[in-house]
Amino acid sequence: MASFTASASTVSAARPALLLKPTVAISAPVLGLPPMGKKKGGVRCSMETKQGNVSVMGAGVSAAATAALTAVMSNPAMALVDERMSTEGTGLPFGLSNNLLGWILFGVFGLIWTFFFVYTSSLEEDEESGLSL
């Protein structure tokens, strides 16, 4: 893995008597981005099992009630569509977020179909051409 660093060090002097303090060299892993502080942190996951005195009959009834309630109350998920986001899974036809894209697709398909039609009309029709039955 290669790492690129960029650093700059400049000294400015307006007059010989007034020297400005030299700027400190700044090292960043990527040119143009500020350096990120190293934070120590993390995520700790754990799982524990709680065992209780749940009757089998009560669990079956509650599961059936939950399934019935879910079936009755389920609504389709609504996606947040922003211009910066992709249109996958948003319910837009063909994933087209702009009507102009549909016309472009239609025009390209029509242009290719026109070229194919003109090309096939200029072919000779004989027994081995496969264009006639």
From Swiss-Prot:
Q: Tell me how this protein sits in the membrane.
A: Single-pass membrane protein
Location in the cell reads: Plastid, Chloroplast thylakoid membrane
Which GO terms of type biological process are on file?
photosynthesis; photosystem II stabilization
Primary location group: plastid
Q: Which residues cross the membrane?
A: 100-120
Segments on the Lumenal, thylakoid face: 80-99
Give the transit peptide, as a residue range.
1-53, 54-79
According to its record, what are the GO cellular component terms?
Answer: chloroplast thylakoid membrane; photosystem II
Q: Which domain of life is it from?
A: Eukaryota
Name the family.
Belongs to the psbW family.
What does it do? Stabilizes dimeric photosystem II (PSII). In its absence no dimeric PSII accumulates and there is a reduction of monomeric PSII.
Q: What is this protein called?
A: Photosystem II reaction center W protein, chloroplastic
Q: Which organism is it from?
A: Arabidopsis thaliana (Mouse-ear cress)
